[in-house]
């Protein structure tokens, strides 16, 4: 029997596909929702590049640049508390603490003023990045998808339903209890409402989309055997450890 996540996914399929026998099981990536038995079925993961001024500066970029976007596959999600295998083809895996916005109502060309009505809730996240692969791709002016969109590269905590989060909420990242990143949500160059407005001008957002809203300054490496914990005031943490 199909579980609730798969039933919800099937309900969103085109009518002609609903009774189709597929060669493989339909993927059903999802995230836990605080206080609910239902889970948040994930459709897509969008990420915002350079959305904190100090982080842009530490990589030599102009913090006034408009927001730009890239994707991670939905099945890159891993829940908080997971022990991960260290990723292949990298010697410089970096943490990036991020606020995650969960979209509950879709739309295209959403205005900043109406953006909150499209939000389901918020979560803590970690946009894991193979920094050496990213640097190499950038130096050759090639796409850097494989530095971001790899297996188990999106650690996401439990989603807390809500329409807004305080700009004074702190966002922090610790590696083995050493504080690496420490900022406030209000330090974003482009606030959540403007991120949603900009992204929805490129693509129609849909229920189930997640938006990782950028990381503050202080990104750095996480080695084999180390643990990494991201905290945002008022939200459950997103924590993982790389096995030895």
Where are these regions (language model features)?
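Catalytic-pocket segment enriched in acidic/His residues
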Residues: 17-39, 55, 61-63, 123, ...
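Short amphipathic alpha-helical "recognition" segments used for binding
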Residues: 8-9, 16, 100-102, 182
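Extended, compositionally biased flexible segments
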Residues: 17-120
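N-terminal amphipathic/basic-hydrophobic helices that include classical n-h-c signal peptides
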Residues: 1-19
């Amino acid at each position: 029997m199909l579980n609730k996540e798969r039933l919800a996914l099937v309900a969103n399929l085109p009518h002609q596909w609903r009774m189709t026998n597929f060669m493989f099981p339909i993927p059903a990536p999802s995230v836990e929702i605080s206080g609910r038995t239902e889970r948040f079925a994930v459709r897509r993961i969008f990420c915002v590049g350079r959305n904190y001024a100090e982080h842009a500066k530490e990589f030599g970029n102009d913090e006034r640049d408009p927001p730009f976007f890239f994707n991670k596959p939905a099945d890159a999600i891993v829940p908080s508390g997971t022990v991960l295998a260290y990723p292949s083809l990298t010697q410089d895996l970096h943490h990036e603490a991020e606020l995650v916005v969960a979209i509950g109502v879709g739309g295209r060309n959403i205005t900043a003023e109406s953006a909150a009505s499209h939000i389901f809730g918020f979560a803590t996240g970690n946009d894991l990045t193979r920094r050496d692969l990213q640097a190499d791709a950038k130096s050759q002016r090639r796409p850097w998808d494989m530095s971001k969109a790899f297996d188990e590269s999106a650690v996401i905590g439990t989603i807390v339903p809500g329409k807004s989060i305080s700009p004074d909420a702190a966002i922090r990242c610790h590696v083995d209890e050493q504080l690496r990143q420490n900022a406030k949500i209000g330090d974003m160059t482009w606030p959540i409402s403007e991120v949603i407005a900009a992204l929805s001008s490129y693509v129609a957002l849909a229920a189930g989309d997640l938006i990782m809203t950028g990381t503050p300054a202080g990104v750095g490496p996480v080695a084999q055997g180390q643990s990494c914990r991201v905290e945002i005031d008022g939200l459950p943490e997103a924590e993982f450890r790389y096995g030895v």
